[in-house]
Design a protein with these regions (language model features):
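Radical SAM enzyme [4Fe-4S]-AdoMet core and its adjacent flexible, acidic
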Residues: 145-153, 160, 164-278, 282, ...
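Conserved AdoMet/S-adenosylmethionine-binding subsite of the radical SAM
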Residues: 58, 80-199, 206-208, 212
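Disulfide-bonded cysteines in secreted/extracellular proteins and peptides
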Residues: 24, 28-31, 277, 283, ...
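Conserved alpha-helical substructure of the radical SAM core
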Residues: 1-119, 123-124
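Flexible mid-to-C-terminal extensions adjoining Fe-S/redox cofactors in radical SAM and related proteins
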Residues: 302-411
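Short, acidic, Ser/Thr-enriched surface-loop or helix-capping motifs
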Residues: 290
Length: 411
């Protein structure tokens, strides 16, 4: 696959798979998915059966209308299913694919990678997303195993094995309350390990208490007892972080190192699809299927109230095109407060992820994004550079010309 940022938006149905549910060999303190196992207290083994795997693959392929189909394997920790499981998946993809081009992306924490896994990924053209939050002292702040032991060196061993076997991979980094203070150390680390494709996600979670034992809350839940999780990134610092990394990237890395958020911002600047749901006008394009066939509206909305149904009783098309799911997607724009709809940067952020929209505006309207302050700071900072790159693209010139332009104008 030549492009590591494959956008699902052109496809009629896109559903991520959770072959082991929330089961993981790590216990990262900020993980939003680890507690989802509590939604299924009656089930001992949260493992997707091969029968369900076949049902999903057959139905998923039958409902596609495009010649290219993307499968995304997500966790929990995906490599806790054996290679034989994924070999079976490839066999089923070939059986039901009817000649389509099928791509596979898999997300992993990297600690279980070995030569066998890397050979398998290389031979079958998997794109691997590996979770790593920066250099050792930053990464190990939150990414530890169930015994509290650090994971950095195991992840780095996995990355070295992927390089050895020529596996295409990108880095998935979480920006939290700790590493947000070290933007340049964070960015330089990825350059030092020669990782050219980087996705970073700000962590924003709120903690409450629910009868099923879960702590994380959906944005609709408003209660005096709900508090921001201590690892949540500060909104203003998030903006400072983005500006600092952007300025460093602008010096010599445009066109060589690809940072998804910067690419998506530029796409919105020129009126194209951003390639990520958070910055798109609507969402609801990307559902998720749990180990038992339950389908939810989104990976970040795996709450009982956002369950669409189960593949054993409803088709994927019925669930993903249900009025409920269509409303979920349309509400991303429709429920924005007036402050957002009148904002100069609405086109760039589109309110960002609905899960982060739990604040009220100065006028008391609900639905303001917690990260608004940071994103505004970032968009204002990058506006002249985005304007220039937009002009270059429209003139069919490389946007990397912005580096020389910035130097000449001493920006």
């Amino acid at each position: 696959m030549s492009n590591p940022y494959i956008s699902p938006f052109a496809k009629p149905v896109y559903v991520m798979l959770k072959p082991v549910g929330s089961v993981c060999n790590l216990a990262c303190e900020y993980c939003y998915y680890l507690e989802k196992g509590k939604l299924y207290p009656e089930v001992k083994n949260h493992i997707m059966s091969e029968q369900l795997l076949e049902k999903f693959i057959k139905e998923y392929l039958e409902c596609q209308t495009m010649p290219q189909v993307l499968f995304t394997w997500h966790g929990g920790e995906t490599l806790m299913r054996p290679i034989s499981f994924y070999k079976k998946a490839l066999e089923l993809q070939r059986r039901y694919g009817r000649g389509r081009q099928i791509d596979n992306c898999i997300q992993t924490n990297g600690t279980l990678l070995n030569d066998d896994w890397c050979r398998f990924f290389k031979e079958n053209n998997f794109l691997v997303g590996v979770s790593i939050d920066g250099p050792q002292e930053i990464h190990d702040e939150y990414r530890r195993n169930k015994q509290g032991l650090p994971s950095f060196y195991k992840v780095m061993k996995g990355i070295e094995l992927m390089k050895k076997h020529g596996v295409e991979y990108n880095a998935m980094a979480v920006v939290n309350d700790y590493n947000v203070d070290y933007p340049l150390e964070f960015y330089h680390f990825f350059k030092e390990i020669d990782c050219h494709y980087i996705q970073f996600t700000p962590i924003v979670e709120r903690l409450g208490f629910h009868q099923d034992g879960t702590l994380l809350t959906s944005p609709e839940q408003q209660d005096a007892n709900i508090k921001l999780a201590p690892f949540t990134v500060d909104a203003g610092k998030w903006g400072d972080f983005l500006c600092a990394v952007f300025d460093e990237w602008l010096k010599e890395d445009v066109g060589n190192y690809y940072i998804q958020l910067f690419d998506s911002t530029l796409a919105n600047w020129v009126g194209e699809q951003p390639g990520v749901c958070t910055l798109a006008r609507t969402c609801g394009h990307a559902g998720v299927m749990e180990f038992n066939g339950d389908v939810y509206a989104c990976d970040h909305f795996v709450f009982p109230e956002y369950k669409l149904g189960n593949i054993h009783t409803q088709t994927l098309t019925e669930m993903m095109y249900s009025q409920r799911q269509l409303k979920f997607g349309a509400d991303k724009y429709e429920t924005l407060p007036t402050q957002c709809k009148e904002c100069d940067y609405l086109f760039a952020c589109n309110g960002e992820c609905p899960k982060n929209r739990f604040l009220h505006t100065a006028n008391g309207e609900p639905g303001l994004n917690y990260l608004c302050r940071g994103y505004k700071k970032f968009f204002k900072h990058v506006a002249p550079y985005m304007d220039f790159m937009k002009k270059e693209l429209l003139a069919e010139r490389p946007p990397a010309n912005v580096m020389q332009w910035a130097k000449e104008n001493k920006l």
